[in-house]
Each structure stands twice: as structure tokens, then as C-alpha cells.
Amino acid sequence: MINTIEGFFMNYQPAIEVVRGGTVESIHHAAIAVVDPEGKLVASWGLPETSTYMRSSAKPFQVLPLLEAGGASRFDFSLQEIALMCASHTGTDAHVRIALSIQEKVGVSEGDLLCGVHPPYDPETADRLKQEGIEPTANRHNCSGKHSGMLAFARLIGAPLEDYILPEHPIQKRILKVLGEMCDLGGEEIRIGVDGCSVPTFAVPLESAATAFARLADPGSLSQSRADACRAVWQAMTTYPEMVAGPGRFDTALMSAAKG
């Protein structure tokens, strides 16, 4: 991890210059890794081995154990519901409806979520709730889909619903193992922090994260069950990009414009 200014400039190199009137106004640094599904580095900028927290970009991998264990068929999850489990959503009424649907199928409630509460990211929804005097609840949290998926996995394997956010909980141990396999890393090579929604978050080398995403998009080299889970995630997110974020959000707009 980078702990000094000197370390930052070693790992990240100038990538974009913003020019105004012939004068460079700002410089944006980056570390970039382009990797194929076999883990081969194809292109890079800066240091591709730079370690960084995946944060919400890990969500598609955090749902893989649930799908690989047969959770989609056990609970009859729709693609919309799987997309929400991978989402940093904006808390619209549409997102809340899907979160409630997941919870009803699993047999849990909004009160079981340990993600906390914040106002919806969607400005129109936030303004409406404020005008109506309605306090936001946990399902408005951008990570409510992910947490609902984690509760589903706990229910599926017969693990306690309580404390599902702790690193030592069986579902979090399984998530760490699967992420390590997707990244070609051992669990001891992954640094664990606490994400903003209270679950573990993972610091990995940039090229390792890129390997995981390359395999998510092209899972042909993976086991059948893992490949099927990856394809389900890919199909869900690209079919329902509005579930992954929401109206006016960059990732939803990009997936919609690029058809995936």
C-alpha cells in the first residue's frame, strides 16, 4: 500500500493533462493494468503491481459463492435481483422493490441488514423523501443488494445470519477464498480492511484485480460451476444496468450505451 507522497509518484504516472488556453491546468495520475484471462499482463501504465482496495468493484465477485452454490435456483432469483447484489445503487423506489423481493424470497427482512443507512444517492428520490418527511431506511443504502445477497448465502449454507459482516463468518471466509482464486492470490496475500458498509474489503495488486475481471468476462478456463456463476453475473449486470447504479450514473450510462 502507498503510505507516502513519494510512493504515490512511484506507482502512479501522469496519464491525462487538462489544458486551458495553452496552459496545463491539472494533471491526473493513474496506474493501469490490462490483463488477459490467463493472468498475462498485456499493457500497463504506472506500476501494475500497485496494491489498492477494490471497494465496491469487488461486488461481482462477492456474489459468486452464492451463485456457485446454487443460490439462484434455490431462491429463484431473477437477473434483476442478481444485478442488485452487484450494485452500488442510488436508492430509488425501483431498487428498494428489488431488495425487498430478494429478502422475501430468502426469508429475511430489511432489519437484518447491517449495512447502515444513508440518504438515497438519487437526488429526486432524496428530495421527495425529505419533502414527505420520510426517513431513509437500510434498503436505500447503496449496498443493500450486496448485503441481501450475503444473507441469502448465509441462509443457503445454514450459517448464522447474525454477524455476517465479520471476516471470520463462514460466508466471508468463502468470499475471500473465491476472490483469491479469481485473482490468482492466496488469502494471506490479500489485505483486509473494513468497507463503508461494514463488510470486509480487499486490497490486491491492480494486475490481480484485472485478472479477476478478465475471467469474469471470459470464464472459459474456470470450472463449470464458477464459469456459470460468472456468466450469470455478467448477464445480470449488462441486461439491467439501471440496477447496478441508477439514472444519471456513469456506469449505468456506459453499459446502456455500449450494450454491456
Give the ranges of each region predicted by the language model.
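Active-site-proximal alpha-helical segments within enzyme catalytic domains
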Residues: 200-219, 229-236
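Conserved SxxK-family serine transpeptidase/carboxypeptidase catalytic domain
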Residues: 224-260
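A short glycine/serine-rich beta->alpha loop
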Residues: 45-53, 85-89, 133-141, 193-200
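Active-site SXXK
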Residues: 54-72
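Beta-lactamase-like hydrolase cores
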Residues: 2-49
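Short, contiguous, pocket-lining structural segments
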Residues: 24, 54, 139-147, 166-171, ...
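Beta-strand segments within the central parallel beta-sheet cores of soluble alpha/beta enzyme folds
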Residues: 76-86, 112-116, 191-196, 225-239
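Active-site-adjacent helix/loop patches that line small-molecule binding or acyl-intermediate pockets
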Residues: 5-12, 78-189
